[in-house]
Design a protein with these regions (language model features):
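A membrane-cytosol interface segment of integral membrane proteins
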Residues: 126-162
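Short, surface-exposed beta-strand-loop junctions and turns on beta-sheet-rich folds
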Residues: 106-109, 116-118, 132-135, 143
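Juxtamembrane "helix-exit" motif on the non-cytosolic side of transmembrane helices
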Residues: 42-50
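Phosphoinositide-dependent membrane-docking surfaces
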Residues: 99, 108-125
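N-terminal membrane-targeting/pre-transmembrane regions
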Residues: 1-40
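Conserved beta-hairpin
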Residues: 68-109
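Hydrophobic alpha-helical transmembrane segments
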Residues: 49-63
Length: 162
């Protein structure tokens, strides 16, 4: 099965963020905790005033939240900009015994063994090599539900789901 596509910046960033949720690196509850943690310093300042300890605590909490926001929202876009090959068309040929990968300056033939399992959500397939190394396949590239099902079956024949 031949798949051809070009990532958009928004699509790549969206796939990156959704992978965090899919693999439970970040859970929705974590985002709620982050939002409430922003209120803690305000409450402490209101109740106890602007002491040195509470000011330092506020800096730590806000720094932590800024780092999480940067990793979750900004880093995917930066990664897309940094790697030129993400801007060019990808051609992936999935066969029973191998996967042929052709993208910009990268041409390689891989055995299925390089990948451990696959995951999917409503918009993407993630073909996972290591814990955080994966190939992102947008589902928008499939012309029909039959093609999508055939690709899913091909993945199921060669890989497991975690």
């Amino acid at each position: 099965m031949l798949l051809e596509f070009t990532y958009t910046k928004k699509e790549y960033a969206d796939g990156w963020r959704r992978f965090f949720f899919l693999t439970k690196v970040i859970k929705k509850f974590d985002l709620v905790v982050m939002a409430f943690s922003l209120l803690i310093p305000l409450y402490l300042f209101y109740q106890y005033g602007f002491t040195r300890f509470y000011i330092m605590l506020a800096f730590v909490i806000y720094f932590f939240n800024i780092v999480i926001v940067a990793v979750f929202f900004i880093r995917p876009y930066m990664f897309y900009q940094e790697y030129e090959q993400l801007h060019h068309p990808y051609k992936l040929l999935f066969e029973d015994d191998k996967i042929t990968f052709d993208a910009h300056a990268i041409h390689s033939t891989l055995s299925w063994d390089i990948y451990k399992h696959y995951m999917e959500n409503k918009d993407y397939f993630y073909i996972i090599q290591k814990k955080r190394t994966y190939a992102l396949i947008p589902k928008r590239i499939f012309a029909s539900e039959n093609e999508l099902s055939a690709f899913r079956q091909l993945l199921t024949d060669h890989l497991t789901t975690p």
